[in-house]
Amino acid sequence: MNRILEGKKTAYYPTRSVFSLYKDGTYHVDWIYKSDQQTYAYDMPALNSSTRPPLSVPSKGFPRGAKVWSAKMGIGAGPVLIKDGMIRNSWVEELLDVASGINPQTCQPRSAIGITQDGKLILFVCEGREQTPDVPGMTLDQLARLMKAFGCVDALNLDGGGSSCMLINGKKTIKPCNKEHQQRPVATVLFAR
């Protein structure tokens, strides 16, 4: 990924977040990166910032705690909101700032997925941009705190904005944030039954 640093186009290599389902049936949030034909999961993100020179390319040795990512499947999104019970909100390290379209510090429609200590899957969506009066949406910090209040020990921000929508038995639960309140066509959806 490229960003402008001191007037020059600069390559960065951020670790990115994934909500993983492992073979033993457990869910976890991880930061991952594919290096040398192997995908590694990390306990911590590479501590990048678009205001500093880029860090090394993630590998087996960097950042610390690398292990082979052995999940059965995963949902890539970001940033991580909660990891191991701690609010992380790693949008700076994942370079998911205003330039990325995430708008982490402004109220926006948001979607998130999380897991509680006892294995309950939490799916969350909120509308925003005043589609309903006095409902501005949430910042990523507010979303992280809410997912923590729901009991999540791991949680991940999913695509928000006009992509935030939840249907239950075919019925919308919020007003999507376009003029017609219609669902935006998206390439990937999450189904639960």
Describe each PLM feature range.
Residues 1-193:
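Gly/Ser/Thr/Pro-rich low-complexity, intrinsically disordered segments
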